[in-house]
C-alpha cells in the first residue's frame, strides 16, 4: 500500500505516537496506514493488548502504569475540601470518616475502603464496581468479593507498606487483582492511630480524578 503523499499533512507510518494516548484515550490519526502502524507498534511494545481473540485492542496494565508515572495531574478543589472538613467537624471520628467515604464513592463512582486500624475496616460503593463490565463476569466478581470478605487481613498485609502520600497501585501491584487499580493513602486524624483511605476501581479508572479525591481527603483529615 502506498504511503502518504508529501504535503498531505499525514505523518509517515512508524512515526512514534504519544504513549499517554494509548494509556488513556488514544485517538487514531487521520491516515489509516499511520494508525495501523502505530497501533501495531504499541501492541509490540506491550502498551496495547487484545483481551481475547475477537476483541479490539485496549490499553494494557503497562500503559496505565506509564500514564500514572509520567502524566498524573493533581486537580485541587477548595469547594470539595470545605465540604469534607465540614463533615469531619460535625460527627465523631468513625462516623465522620464513613460519611466522607460515602461521599467519595458517590463522586468517583468507585468503591471506597477505610482501614481505621489493623483489624477494623469499612467499605462502601461496592455496587459501583459491579456496574463496570469487567466485574460482571462471574469469575471476576467472585474474586473481588472474596478479597473484600478478607478485607481486614488484606489491609493488615499492606498497612505498613502504604506511604504517607497518596499513591496508585496499578493492576497486579495491588492485592485486589489485575483488573483493578487502588488509589491509597495513610492518614492521621487528630490523636488517633493512623488509618488508611483507598479508592478501588477498574484498571481503566479516571486516575487524575480519583488520585485527586484521595489526596485532598487525606490532606483535610491530617489537618484536623
Residue ranges and their predicted role:
Residues 72-224:
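Intrinsically disordered, acidic Ser/Thr/Pro-rich low-complexity regulatory segments
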Residues 1-4:
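Short alpha-helical segments that sit at the start of domains
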Residues 7-11, 16-70:
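N-terminal helix-turn-helix
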Amino acid at each position: 500500500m502506498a504511503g502518504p503523499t508529501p504535503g498531505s499533512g499525514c505523518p509517515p507510518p512508524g512515526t512514534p505516537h504519544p504513549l499517554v494516548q494509548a494509556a488513556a484515550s488514544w485517538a487514531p490519526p487521520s491516515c489509516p496506514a499511520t494508525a495501523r502502524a502505530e497501533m501495531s507498534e504499541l501492541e509490540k511494545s506491550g502498551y496495547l493488548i487484545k483481551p481475547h481473540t475477537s476483541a479490539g485492542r485496549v490499553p494494557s496494565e503497562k500503559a496505565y502504569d506509564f500514564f500514572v508515572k509520567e502524566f498524573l495531574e493533581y486537580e485541587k478543589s477548595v469547594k470539595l475540601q470545605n465540604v469534607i472538613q465540614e463533615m469531619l467537624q460535625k460527627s465523631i471520628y468513625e462516623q465522620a470518616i464513613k460519611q466522607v467515604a460515602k461521599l467519595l464513592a458517590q463522586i468517583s463512582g468507585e468503591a471506597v475502603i477505610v482501614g481505621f486500624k489493623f483489624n477494623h475496616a469499612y467499605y462502601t460503593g461496592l455496587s459501583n464496581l459491579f456496574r463496570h463490565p469487567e466485574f460482571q463476569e462471574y469469575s471476576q466478581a467472585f474474586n473481588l468479593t472474596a478479597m473484600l470478605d478478607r478485607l481486614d487481613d488484606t489491609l493488615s498485609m499492606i498497612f505498613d507498606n502504604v506511604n504517607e502520600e497518596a499513591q496508585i497501585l496499578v493492576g497486579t501491584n495491588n492485592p485486589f487483582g489485575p483488573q483493578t487499580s487502588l488509589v491509597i493513602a495513610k492518614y492521621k486524624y487528630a490523636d488517633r492511630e493512623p488509618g488508611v483511605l483507598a479508592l478501588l476501581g477498574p484498571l481503566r479508572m479516571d486516575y487524575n480524578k480519583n488520585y485527586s479525591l484521595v489526596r485532598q481527603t487525606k490532606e483535610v483529615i491530617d489537618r484536623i
